[in-house]
């Protein structure tokens, strides 16, 4: 243990006083920033596509018809039960094994054979399974009183979902959705395994040329921490803005009668 401390102290002294690490940082920082941009594209595009895919999956999942809920059940079970790395390899290496896929013309040459699009496809499929389960739970957690009020007003089922249930469910899943996006950000490092120059891919390239593994992994870790902090702040602001009416309702009820606020909270729990 003492030898490890001594070696780390020597490395830290060399790192802080030597010029070589800082010169290497300055030389490869533009490539790392390009990798940051690619990582952000992966997370943003996959997060949006996965969110859109999750809505019909969640609606089918809560259906009483076996013909509708069997497919999303199997889909969610597969993508939640297998490693993301395996899913990336299945999309990038697996699709090329089928001649019918290779004969798709520009769809093959421009999309399905490119690591960038294969990574987006794999991440979108993976995150849609998790978000679909979040949506399913949120839809079932919408207070029954709100749905019953809409039914008493004669609002159609489609408009109930469009104007009441889905918007309410989105507010419920926002914190969990933010966590899912952050997990996807950290999982995006696996995209470098299919030759994509995201942040981790650019970091590995810099290490291969400079042999400064610890220094560049530390820098990559700091950049991932910065991206995570930005996402946390963004989703916190989004949650406060989107659910502002809920906080305002609780405050207004408490001013009238504290028992009304307690009753409102009990209805939400139910």
Name each model-derived stretch:
Residues 1-270:
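Transmembrane alpha-helices and adjacent helix-loop boundaries
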């Amino acid at each position: 243990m003492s030898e490890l401390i001594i070696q780390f102290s020597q490395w830290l002294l060399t790192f802080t006083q030597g010029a070589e690490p800082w010169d290497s940082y300055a030389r490869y920082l533009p490539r790392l920033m390009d990798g940051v941009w690619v990582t952000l594209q992966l997370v943003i595009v996959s997060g949006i596509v996965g969110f859109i895919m999750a809505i019909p999956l969640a609606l089918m999942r809560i259906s009483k018809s076996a013909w509708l809920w069997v497919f999303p059940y199997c889909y969610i079970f597969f993508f939640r039960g297998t490693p993301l790395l395996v899913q990336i390899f299945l999309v990038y290496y697996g699709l090329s094994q089928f001649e019918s896929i290779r004969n798709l013309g520009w769809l093959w040459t421009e999309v399905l054979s490119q690591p960038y699009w294969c990574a987006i496809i794999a991440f979108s499929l993976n995150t849609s399974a998790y978000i679909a389960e979040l949506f399913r739970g949120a839809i079932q957690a919408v207070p029954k009183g709100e749905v019953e009020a809409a039914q008493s007003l004669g609002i159609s089922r489609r408009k109930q979902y469009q104007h009441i249930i889905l918007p309410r469910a989105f507010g419920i899943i926002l914190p969990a959705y933010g966590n899912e996006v952050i997990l996807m950000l950290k999982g995006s490092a696996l995209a470098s395994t299919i030759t994509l120059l995201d942040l981790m891919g650019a970091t590995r390239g810099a290490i291969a040329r400079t042999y400064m593994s610890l220094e560049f992994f530390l820098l990559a870790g700091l950049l991932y921490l910065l991206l995570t902090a930005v996402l946390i702040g963004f989703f916190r602001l989004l949650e406060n803005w989107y659910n502002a009416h809920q906080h305002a309702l609780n405050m207004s009820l408490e001013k009238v009668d504290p028992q009304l606020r307690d009753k409102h909270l009990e209805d939400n729990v139910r």
